[in-house]
Each structure stands twice: as structure tokens, then as C-alpha cells.
Design a protein with these regions (language model features):
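ATP-dependent carboxylate-amine ligase catalytic core
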Residues: 9, 26-28, 32-48, 73-160, ...
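Charged, amphipathic alpha-helical linker segments immediately N-terminal to NTP-binding catalytic cores
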Residues: 11-26
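A conserved segment at the C-terminal end of the G1
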Residues: 54, 62-79
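Inter-motif core of Ras-like GTPase G domains
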Residues: 159-169
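Membrane-proximal helix-turn-helix segments that form the acceptor-binding/catalytic region
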Residues: 186-193
Length: 193
């Protein structure tokens, strides 16, 4: 990864993904300060299209995928951001069902790496969320469907002003971050509204 700081170096997909996974050392940091600063440095890409924001304990990924498919069938150009990936990183970011190209992952990783210097240390999820928001803007999507990663109120995806929100079923999950009762967890997830 040190090579990425050498003049003339062009990041490859494999080095980009390796860099991204090293960001997991930052763990989970709930809060919007880093994500807000990062999107400002990117020029607020999330304001270039409409968003549908989906939170919940179970079924949010399926709900997001179905919503994206319905919007695409209606003739919209649709971005879809989900997590986690099952096989490869690029599954997380799609436009009209097509995974983000490897070359774009490398370009955006390099771009974000430069924008984070010297004072931002985003988590893996913040970084990939910013990458998705920028890719959707650059791809000219009409609408982006965003699946919340954890909770909602302080999730990295909550830098958008959605045209609509959905909250799927609520159950006890991530209690160390969201609270120990269904009402407290529902409060956190409803934070996207």
C-alpha cells in the first residue's frame, strides 16, 4: 500500500481492495462527522440524484434489491448499495444491476485516499459508502437505493436526504451499539426518517 504514495503510481483493483480491507482496523464508529466531511470534500455527490433509504433488522437487503429492480423496470437508471458482499467486493455497488467495474474501484479508492489526507480516517464502511455515492453521481443515476449498514441514525448512509425511507422488521441485533430493547433499536433505525 505504500506504493500508492509514489509519484506516477496507479492503483490496481487488487491493491484497492487490499487497502479497503485494511481499513477494518478502524472498526465501527457510529457518527456522521467523518462521512459528512468526506462527502463535502467530494462535492456532495448524494445531492445529484434521489435516494430511497432502507433500514431494519431483517430483510433490508432483499427489500433494497426488489426496490431497485422495480425502479429499473419502470425505466429509471438505478444505483444499489448493499452490504455485506457475498463473494466479491464489487457486489456492494451496482448501477442497473451491473457491479462497479474494477477500474472504478481502483480510481475511487485512490481519489478518496487523497481526499482523506491529512485528517480523515474513515472506517471501511464509511469509505465504501462514499465510494458508492460518488459512483452513482458519476454514473448519472436517477435514483439510488441505499441499505443501512448498522442502525440508521448514525450510519454512514445517513448523509442523504431521501425521497422515501423504509424500515423493515425490527428485532434485537447489535445491542452493544443500538440498545437492548426493541423500542431503543427501532428509535435508532427510525433515525433515517
Amino acid at each position: 500500500w505504500l506504493a500508492s504514495f509514489l509519484p506516477g503510481y496507479t492503483m490496481t483493483y487488487s491493491s484497492a481492495v487490499a487497502y479497503l480491507f485494511r481499513l477494518q482496523k478502524h472498526g465501527i464508529k457510529l457518527g456522521l462527522a467523518t462521512m459528512t466531511a468526506l462527502t463535502v470534500r467530494l462535492g456532495m455527490p448524494q445531492t445529484k440524484y434521489r435516494t430511497l433509504h432502507i433500514a431494519g433488522t431483517n430483510g433490508k437487503g432483499s427489500t433494497a434489491a426488489m426496490a431497485a429492480a422495480l425502479l429499473q423496470a419502470a425505466g429509471y437508471r438505478v444505483g444499489l448499495y448493499t452490504s455485506p458482499h457475498l463473494v466479491e467486493f464489487r457486489e456492494r455497488i451496482r448501477v442497473n444491476g451491473e457491479m462497479i467495474p474494477e477500474s472504478r474501484v481502483a480510481q475511487l479508492t485512490e481519489q478518496l485516499q487523497a481526499l482523506c489526507q491529512p485528517d480523515l480516517s474513515p472506517t471501511f464502511f464509511e469509505y465504501t459508502t462514499a465510494m458508492a455515492l460518488q459512483h452513482f453521481a458519476d454514473s448519472g443515476v436517477d435514483v439510488a437505493v441505499l441499505e443501512v449498514g448498522l442502525g440508521g441514525r448514525f450510519d454512514a448512509t445517513n448523509v442523504v436526504t431521501p425521497m422515501a425511507c423504509a424500515v423493515t422488521t425490527i428485532a434485537l441485533d447489535h445491542q452493544e451499539y443500538l440498545g437492548t430493547t426493541c423500542p431503543s433499536i427501532a428509535f435508532e433505525k427510525a433515525g433515517i426518517i
